[in-house]
């Protein structure tokens, strides 16, 4: 079985205490990374308690731990000394439990995942084994890159680079593959789409032909590659890659990968004008993620599904439906942790703004909708990434057009075209340029 802990294997009650704890850790990890969230949490919570590991039960407690971890690493640095003695089995199990929780929760509960990532790094630095430090440092450093602050992003990228050098020093292809993938994730967060695709696919190559045991690493790499291809508008590359990933995920019974791959299949269908197929992909993904084993909340998977659904509504000239979808999800989005993370934050703000602007074309409440779109554009303009500022310029131009300010609209669309080209987003640039040409008529 995919989880590696199926009921038809040797009964767990026959295992010794050390083997039992290892089996619990593996079960928690595999449940979580494959999308069996409730099953994973049911194993992880008592496991963390039994090992005296922190498991923050509220968002505020998790945020407090993040602040303390950040201060700790700022004060002590990330230096370490090679170990002078082997790691005790109980301590090794705690390290691996932290790692299992950090990666297993990363695309479900990023705030709690970050607390485990910090605990993992703290313990790995204390022990000093270079391979474990490389793994922990690369993963923890993504927290800085994800936020969007230029200063923190630079620090995060420097730490990821150091982790990659440590991994290369070990000669372990799995560790080198992981840190290569994480370098690609950092590229994506910085808007370097082509480099992101190159690096995450190089990381997959370093992992070799293995599928079991590195499923999470392969899934994260593929998810990043799919997102980068969407930003590039490279639909001919996206479709076959997403379909191949979906087939593999179905063979493994990997719910997480089935959902994410299926949604990118939906994007490829939408680009091919298969609106019904795109809608079906979104519906299938939502149903699968809402099946048994998923906790309440608004996860990465909900964000990806909402983006495809809103795109379908706009492509089908249904702005009321697009706005209703975003508005219905907005309270859950606000209470989630996704707006702390740069990539979904930019996408979600743009999604809401585009829905508002589209509806303003046909609504009697035009003034209110234009104010909403303008406010969201202002938020996007404050983001450090160029493509966010491009989206802001295009949205402001759209607002100006509906207000009858044609010269301002032309300037805005021209600026957005330049910025989208600078962001290596030719399809977005072409769409804006088409709107600019329409204004010239």
What residue ranges belong to the model's regions?
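Amphipathic alpha-helical segments of tetratricopeptide repeats
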Residues: 9-13, 46-56, 121-125, 161-171, ...
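Hydrophobic, small-residue-rich alpha-helical packing segments that form membrane-like cores
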Residues: 148-251
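Generic long, charged, amphipathic alpha-helical segments
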Residues: 366-432
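Extended alpha-helical scaffolding segments used for macromolecular assembly and cargo binding
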Residues: 1-34, 38-47, 87-129, 133-136, ...
């Amino acid at each position: 079985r995919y989880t590696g802990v199926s009921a038809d294997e040797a009964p767990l009650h026959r295992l010794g205490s050390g083997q039992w704890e290892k089996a619990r850790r593996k079960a928690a990890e595999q449940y979580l990374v494959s999308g069996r969230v409730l099953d994973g949490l049911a194993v992880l919570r008592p496991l963390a308690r039994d090992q005296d590991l922190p498991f923050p039960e509220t968002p505020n407690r998790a945020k407090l731990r993040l602040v303390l971890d950040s201060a700790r690493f700022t004060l002590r640095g990330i230096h370490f000394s090679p170990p002078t003695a082997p790691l005790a089995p109980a301590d090794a199990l705690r390290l691996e439990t932290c790692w299992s929780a950090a990666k297993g929760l990363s695309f479900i509960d990023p705030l709690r995942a970050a607390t485990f990532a910090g605990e993992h790094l703290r313990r790995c630095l204390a022990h000093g084994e270079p391979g474990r430090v490389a793994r922990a440092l690369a993963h923890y450093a993504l927290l800085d890159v994800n936020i969007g602050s230029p200063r923190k992003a630079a620090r995060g990228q420097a730490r990821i680079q150091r982790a990659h050098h440590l991994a290369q020093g070990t000669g372990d292809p799995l560790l080198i593959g992981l840190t290569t993938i994480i370098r690609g994730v950092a590229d994506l967060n910085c808007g370097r789409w082509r480099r992101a695709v190159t690096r995450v696919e190089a990381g997959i190559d370093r992992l070799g032909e293995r599928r079991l045991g590195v499923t999470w690493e392969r899934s994260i790499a593929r998810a990043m590659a799919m997102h980068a291809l969407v930003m590039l508008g490279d639909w001919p590359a996206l479709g076959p890659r997403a379909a191949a990933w979906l087939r593999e995920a179905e063979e493994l019974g990997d719910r997480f990968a089935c959902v994410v791959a299926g949604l990118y299949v939906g994007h490829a269908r939408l680009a091919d004008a298969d609106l019904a197929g795109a809608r079906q992909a979104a519906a299938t993904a939502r149903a699968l993620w809402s099946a048994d084993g998923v906790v309440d909340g608004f996860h990465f998977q909900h964000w990806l599904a909402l983006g495809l659904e809103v795109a379908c509504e706009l492509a089908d000239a249904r702005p009321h439906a697009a706005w209703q979808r975003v508005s219905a999800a907005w309270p859950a989005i606000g209470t989630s942790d996704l707006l702390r993370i740069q990539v979904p934050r930019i996408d979600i703000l743009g999604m809401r703004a585009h829905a508002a602007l589209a509806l303003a074309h046909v609504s009697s409440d035009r003034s209110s909708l234009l104010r909403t779109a303008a406010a969201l554009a202002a938020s996007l303009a404050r983001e450090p990434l160029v493509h966010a500022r491009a989206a802001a310029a295009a949205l402001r131009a759209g607002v100006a057009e509906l207000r009858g300010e044609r010269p301002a609209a032309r300037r805005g669309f021209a600026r957005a075209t330049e910025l989208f080209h600078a962001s290596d987003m030719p399809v977005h640039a072409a769409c804006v340029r088409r709107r600019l040409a329409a204004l010239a008529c």
